[in-house]
Amino acid sequence: MPQQIELRNIALQAAQPLVHGVSLTLKRGRVLALVGGSGSGKSLTCAATLGILPAGVRQTAGEILADGKPVSPCALRGIKIATIMQNPRSAFNPLHTMHTHARETCLALGKPADDATLTAAIEAVGLENAARVLKLYPFEMSGGMLQRMMIAMAVLCESPFIIADEPTTDLDVVAQARILDLLESIMQKQAPGMLLVTHDMGVVARLADDVAVMSDGKIVEQGDVETLFNAPKHAVTRSLVSAHLALYGMELAS
């Protein structure tokens, strides 16, 4: 399995250019946070990595490398990169139970799909009464439960990399804390490389090792999390950090 995945000069376009020459490097055992406002190109960059661009959007430049060798997105999806989606309710087939979703995921990747394996993954993400959970349909579960189920399926994939696209969006504070605890636990136990897409600098401060800031389809600043919080350079980065510090009655040093 690769130890590093690199996005090199990725450019995306629809009727007009959307993402301009984005380069990112994911490394095993490290969390790279991709931050920026809505419409900055974060989710499109993830979609390009996985080969699931929306209709009408095409990649016009750039490549993806695994340990320095060019690779297609379809060769990464699932086997090498697991995904935790922004809106878990839309990610599940409403006609299938959690058992069917989990089992089909495992079988598609050639992983064990016995009930003991599925139960262990569900228990690992803190969902009580795994036997009951496996019988549930998506509409019978809360947003927090579905997000934890998404994480359980990412665990089942045993992929060396994870893309987590706004994993705490639209969840209440308690559910958000539980999701962050789970992601932190996965990093400690499995040490994947993680691309964490978020607009929440509190999430960045807690989980990230490195940060890339996007604005208008471009990476405007990159660095380790400590440097970015203590000495942000770009105006967008300074605005994000200042807004985060203001929540605690603090100000960014001039």
From Swiss-Prot:
Top-level EC class as recorded in UniProt: translocase
GO molecular function terms listed in the Swiss-Prot or TrEMBL record: ABC-type nickel transporter activity; ATP binding; ATP hydrolysis activity; nickel cation binding
Ranges of residues in domain ABC transporter: 2-241
Cysteine disulfide partners in this protein: none
SUPFAM superfamilies: P-loop containing nucleoside triphosphate hydrolases
Keywords: ATP-binding, Cell inner membrane, Cell membrane, Ion transport, Membrane, Nickel, Nickel transport, Nucleotide-binding, Translocase, Transport
Annotated catalysed reactions: Ni(2+)(out) + ATP + H2O = Ni(2+)(in) + ADP + phosphate + H(+)
Topological relation to the membrane, as annotated: Peripheral membrane protein
Subcellular location field: Cell inner membrane
Keyword Transcription regulation in annotation: no
Binding site for ATP: G36, G37, S38, G39, S40, G41, K42, S43
Pfam entry (one): ABC_tran
Entry EC no(s): 7.2.2.11
This protein's GO CC annotations: plasma membrane
Subunit structure, as described in the record: The complex is composed of two ATP-binding proteins (NikD and NikE), two transmembrane proteins (NikB and NikC) and a solute-binding protein (NikA).
Chain's role: Part of the ABC transporter complex NikABCDE involved in nickel import. Responsible for energy coupling to the transport system.
Family as reported in the entry's similarity comment: Belongs to the ABC transporter superfamily. Nickel importer (TC 3.A.1.5.3) family.
Name under which the protein is recorded: Nickel import ATP-binding protein NikD
Organism (species): Escherichia coli O157:H7
